[in-house]
Every structure is written in C-alpha cells, then in structure tokens.
Amino acid sequence: NQGRAVKFFAEQVEKASGGKMRVRAIGSAALGPDTQMQQALIGGAQEMMVGSTATLVGVAPQMALWDTPFLINNTREADALLDGPVGDKVKAALEPKGMVGLAYWENGFRNLTNNKHPVAKLEDMSGIKLRVMQNNVFLDSFKALGANAVPLPFSELFTALETRAVDGQENPYNTIVSSKFYEVQKYLTVTNHVYSPWIVTVSKKWWDQLSAAEKKVLQEAAVKSREFERKDTREEAAKALADLKQKGMQVNELSVADANRMREKLTSVHSTVASGVG
C-alpha cells in the first residue's frame, strides 16, 4: 500500500504544479535500506524517501519516541499525537541533520508472531529468539520482556525464520501478509505493542534550492497523501488479519491485564526513551 500512496502523492504533485514537477518512484528498496537512503538525502544525492521512523533514531534520537512500547492505544490517539505539536517537534529535529520531514504516514500497530507457542502472558516470552529492528529501544524492550532479542535487517528476516535461526518477529499485519511470514510462522499474538509510523522526508540540501511555491506543492501533496495512505493502510490491516487466520495462523489476543504486566516491565525502557528524547 506504500506504493499506492506514493503514486497518489506523485499525481498530486504533478496536478498542483501544472505538470512542472514530477515524482519518479523507485520501490522495493532498490536504492538500498533506509539508513543508506537517509545518508543519500543528507548528502543531496537523493531528493526524497518514505521510510520508518525507527531507522531514523541514528540521525535524530527524538524519533525514538515513536518506538516507545504501549505509548499509543489506538489510531485516533496516533493521529492526534503525530499531527500535533509533539509530532512537529520530533520532525523538526531532522532539519539540523540535513533532512526535512513533510508528513507521517502509517505503517501500523506491531504484533508478535512466533513458531514455538502462543504468547498469552508475559512468561510466554521467555526464551523466544525474536528478531527485532536494529534499534536500541526495540532491543531493550524485548530483553526486558524476557525474549532473546536478535537485531537483524528486514531483508534477512524471512530466511532467518525459515531456517529457524530466529523463532519469531514483530510487525504490522500488512507486513506479515506481504512478506509471507505466515508460510514460516504458526502463532500470531495481537499485542499492538508499538504504533509504527512511516515518515515522508526530503533532502534539506535539495529543499533549500526550491521556491516557496514548489515547497508548498510538496508539503500539501504529502498531507493529502497522508490521509489517503492512512485510510488505505487501515482497510488493508483489517483484511490482512482475516487473511492470516484463513491461511492457518493461530491467533490470540493479549488481554488488557497481561498488556499492563508487560508495560510494568518496561518502565526502565520508558525512562531511557524519555531522557533521550527530552
């Protein structure tokens, strides 16, 4: 669905600029992983990207706020937080580092899959070898919950699950479906433990060369595409969960009481994020 949103964004840009501005989309990580593209934006070799906020922590530590487990309970809260002054403040932290944030899109609420057993309570996390993003908040969070957290690039994840190098992973439903993790994972626990945004960013070197009118076209197109992308992502997520059940994954939902027990285990992680974000 990210591809559909980029196409929508490109159409908005072309339309609003009267055909003077055109967006060429390059998908499937053809320009490298997020971290490589970030450096290309900072250096001015690439103009724009849509990527995970979690991979931007190395550029702007404030982005770690969005990795905080159990920070956001539902999409209404997510929209209010990301599109309000807090979201703007976190976005603004990118500018001194050479990037400009235009809008937050939605990746979705992350949920847990594994091959060992259903995770219904905190104790069930113990001993699960779980792939996490190469990000300290994710690493520290799952260690605190008792899992054996293994940082791995996303591109290596399917093979790691298939060969049982790791037992499980955590991602939004749409990613679990599109990456076919249901082929190599048996259990899905609805944890909604982290709300993951995407962010549309541009190279500051390039941005500073644009006219005020050109900047306005891009900014407004990013906001319009945000609304399109969120609606699309939420519709797809509902379908994806039904699809995963149909494909044979055993699905259980973490109770509120057990989610609260996990939240209590994460107080030190929350404190670390708070001091890092400021």
Which ranges hold each PLM region?
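N-terminal secretory/targeting leader peptides
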Residues: 1-77, 85-88, 92-278
